[in-house]
Amino acid sequence: MAINFPEGTQDLPSKIVQVVQATYTGSSTHASSSFTDTGIQVSITPKSSSSKVLIMTSFLFGQTKSVNAVQDNMKYFTLFRGSTNIAPGNTRFFAHQNESGTSANFDEQTQVASITYLDSPATTSSTTYKLRCSSDNPSQVTISINRRGIADNTGSSTMIAMEVET
């Protein structure tokens, strides 16, 4: 879904040029120490190479843990523009770790998270933003998107790209 704003309809220092939203209703699982696509993504074609693109994503995730442990493994989430990690320092936007529990406890949990980032893609070509995830110990933890670790889909995730003319 895209919303376009005709020139001159806003009298602000910055103008919203267009808004694109994508909703991911499927589910996916990830067991990798490298960042892998979650299926949550949005594409936008900026009208000006000087525009900024505000990316907002809200997503659900769970996990399956293969062993009981006092402390959980780390799960990492970041945004990519094409093949480029756009997190500060090319690292990640956030890491998540539950404090304690059994593998059964971890399998039952669902978390909701969000990332918001103002990007400067400097292009007028179609640009795809993707949410990717990884973990510090993929042999012990599998990240699930839009579901608990042991259940079917429990919801949907969205990503919005908003072109802002500055």
Locate each region found by the language model.
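Terminal beta-strand-rich extracellular "head" domains
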Residues: 23-24, 29-34, 46-126, 130-166
